[in-house]
Amino acid sequence: MKNKNYMKISQEIKITFLTTIFIGIIAHLYMYTNRIVNHDAVFSVAFSGSTYTNGRWLLELMSKVAYLFNGNYVTPWGIGAITLILYAIAACLLVKTFNMKNKYICGCLGAIVVVYPTVTANNLYIFTAHYYAFAFLLVTLATYLISRYNYTMKNI
């Protein structure tokens, strides 16, 4: 028996989500299965680096929430899975925002989102990769809401 909620999801969204996950695994598998340590990862073992002082206030709040679930452990495969899921959801929101109907372009958009150079560079700092993926998701969500519901400053 098929799930009715799954059947309601459009084919474009399914293709975008699965392509983003699949291409992300292919592109970043080495980083997610190996612990590559850089200068910042050694220094920031027990905390997320400069937060409030650099204007990254949400990073501090999110790291406190993540501490409740994971402690101070940096597990690249776990963080990588969360990161890929967040980027896949963001890619699906981009498809909805631009009302894309071509399945090949939807798949390409998901692939571009997950292999973009900033995503690859963020994976070098794996202990904050999921925080920046969440930030990207929030940006795409805001863009989607503005385009769909025409929210502007004058409506507030």
Give the location of each predicted region:
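Start-transfer (signal-anchor) and selected internal transmembrane alpha helices
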Residues: 1-25
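Membrane-interface micro-motifs in multi-pass membrane enzymes
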Residues: 52, 56, 79, 83-86, ...
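Low-complexity, highly charged intrinsically disordered N-terminal segments
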Residues: 71-92, 99
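Membrane-water interface at transmembrane helix exits
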Residues: 63, 67, 95-99, 144-151
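Membrane-interface alpha helices of multi-pass inner-membrane proteins
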Residues: 154-156
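Juxtamembrane "helix-exit" motif on the non-cytosolic side of transmembrane helices
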Residues: 30-38, 66-69, 115-125
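Extracytoplasmic catalytic/substrate-binding loops of multi-pass membrane glycan-assembly enzymes
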Residues: 26-44, 50-62
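Short hydrophobic/aromatic helix or loop-helix immediately within or flanking a transmembrane segment
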Residues: 50-77, 81
